[in-house]
Amino acid sequence: MAESYLLDKLKSVEQTFNELTRRLGDPDTASNPDEYQEIAKSRSSLEEVVNTYEIWKTAQEDLIGAREVYKESASDPELQEMASLEVKELEEKIEHLESRLKVLLLPRDPNDEKNIMLEIRAGTGGDEASIWAGDLMQMYTRYAQTQGWKVSLVSESRGEMGGWKEVILEIKGNDVYSQLKFEAGVHRVQRVPATESGGRVHTSTATVAIMPEVDDVEIHIDPKDIEMTTARSGGAGGQNVNKVETAVDLMHKPTGIRIFCTEERSQLQNKERAMQILRAKLYDIKLGEQQAAVTSMRRSQVGTGSRSEKIRTYNYKDNRATDHRLGQNYSLTPVLDGDLETLIQSCISLDQQERLAELATSAAN
């Protein structure tokens, strides 16, 4: 591997991995379940890097041997040809392993493993924008189902002609944030609305926010900053309807963020859910400030997650979904049916390429 900074990093990771392995075998560690679990998790996060590095080192040794055989077999054309093929195969294998190692060494987003709050807000376009927000909600729900994730409706404000003015979903599962974080931004649709009698194509938008779930340790909220009122809910049917004040209207005074929760069956549950959404929103603001500092130095093609950033256009007439960051078109129907995997992986790959280029540049300076 030509890049010495990567070799140094790999050696450091290997040393850390070996030390963590040693500590796991220490009786003192085994007697402390919390410490043992934390060390085991840290070790597990390095395991793929170390295993790939070991395969790379073995391949390097094999390559040295194959080149030696090639040099010494000048008098045996058949053996030399076999050695030549082995050299080529090993060089390709090493190149692939080095590419993989570079990706594995990229700093991992600490939020990648988290569950999320997915918020969709109708933008420009009136009733059609609300209907479009509903279509996006269905798209993400279907994608989540293909991933085996659990989707729950936590807050909603329905549109007059269907769809939602605003809807918040909670999505739980493995690595949800890592898969969906690049979906944040403005989603534009071009189509003839169901409400359009003249057959004219309209352009409407909806804004998607992807917020990692956080606990009260990560985001502290002063109770004095909260103003809460209750209301009667028309939610869960039966004798509760319009008789018990289960709905919660919560205002965070410093930011002006307002959350109205009616989906749970009790006032306490709705209050807890509203606080959960508020923590996610405040953390999202904090993340946005951090990302703004980074992107002031480097403009990311894959996107900053800004709510004002147009990331995709869905054209019904041409059955085409265009991702503006990737500069690629996709068939619209499968995308709306939740077939987002290729698109999402392309965004992840683009982000990795950008960060690798940045890493190489910083190492050269």
Swiss-Prot record:
MF term (GO), any: translation release factor activity, codon specific
InterPro entries found in the cross-reference section: PCRF, Pep_chain_release_fac_I, Pep_chain_release_fac_I_sf, Prokaryotic/Mito_RF, RF-1
A single Gene Ontology CC term: cytoplasm
SUPFAM superfamilies: Release factor (SSF75620)
UniProt keyword list: Cytoplasm, Methylation, Protein biosynthesis
Disordered as annotated region, ranges: 21-42
N5-methylglutamine modification, residue list: Q239
Cell location: Cytoplasm
Protein role: Peptide chain release factor 1 directs the termination of translation in response to the peptide chain termination codons UAG and UAA.
Stated name of the protein: Peptide chain release factor 1
UniProt organism field: Nostoc punctiforme (strain ATCC 29133 / PCC 73102)
Source organism phylogeny: Bacteria, Bacillati, Cyanobacteriota, Cyanophyceae, Nostocales
